[in-house]
A protein has these predicted regions:
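Secretory pathway targeting signatures of secreted, lumenal, and periplasmic proteins
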Residues: 67-119, 155-158
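Compositionally biased, proline/threonine/alanine/serine-rich low-complexity intrinsically disordered stretches
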Residues: 25-54
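N-terminal "mature-domain start" segment
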Residues: 43-85
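Bacterial signal peptide processing site
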Residues: 18-21
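Second-shell loop/turn segments in exported
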Residues: 104-111, 136, 185-189
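Signature of long, low-cysteine stretches enriched in small and polar/charged residues
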Residues: 121-171
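Surface-exposed amphipathic alpha-helical segments
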Residues: 77, 175-207
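Sec-dependent bacterial lipoprotein signal peptides
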Residues: 1-15
Length: 207
């Protein structure tokens, strides 16, 4: 079961590559981390509720030193992957375990970040209209604006449900796409929901 989150990541990576290919041909570009009329939606600040804060009480810090990022995670969560472009922690348990999965993708300096992030937002809004997503918003975490969305509870309790935050940043002179995913299966997501939001809002990253 521990390989299931990797399958989810690969599927998302393929969709990202498709969007990247389209956008690289665009003659309109926004500077990395800049805000244009294309992505000027007002962002909500990522502030945890009391329950979400309590869910992390007595926890630990998950550090991704290679990418200058860190999270607060609950007690007993353990690191499963720490590579240059992928970072994963998870709670105890089988398919109902909670997962933190973070991916970094290096982008060309000319990549149109404003158009891209707006496309992710619009795509999530379309999924919401189609009944696939029940939460979509511009969300600022640690001073960086991105798009957050949450999938609906799956019809089958053992299917996966994801909460994601997508953003672009400049790190060590490199333009990067940041994908922070919190997931579990349908049953586990409800059980771990306060933890998942708490971990997401705790994101610290250099940008």
């Amino acid at each position: 079961m521990k390989h299931i989150p990797v399958v989810l990541v690969l599927g998302f990576a393929l969709s990202l590559c498709n969007l990247t290919g389209k956008l690289k041909n665009s003659n309109t570009s926004g500077g990395p981390g800049s805000t244009s009329t294309e992505s000027s939606g007002e962002a909500e600040h990522g502030t945890p509720t009391a329950a979400q804060t309590q869910a992390l009480a007595g926890g630990q810090t998950a550090k991704w030193d290679q990418q200058g990022m860190s999270w607060s995670v609950p007690p007993k969560w353990t690191e499963t992957t720490n590579e240059s472009k992928m970072f994963m922690w998870r709670s105890p348990g089988g398919s109902e375990a909670a997962n933190l999965i973070v991916n970094i993708s290096a982008m060309d300096e000319s990549f149109p970040t404003d158009i891209s992030i707006k496309a992710f937002y619009d795509g999530a809004k379309t999924r919401a209209k189609n009944g696939e997503v029940d939460e979509v918003k511009w969300l600022e975490i640690d001073g960086l604006k991105g798009v957050e969305f949450r999938e609906i509870n799956p019809e089958k309790a053992d299917d996966f449900r994801r909460l994601q935050w997508l953003a672009y940043r400049k790190y060590n002179g490199q333009l990067q796409f940041v994908n922070v995913m919190l997931s579990s299966n349908g049953t586990g997501f409800i059980k771990h929901q306060d933890e998942l939001y708490g971990v997401m809002y705790s994101t610290k990253l250099v940008h």
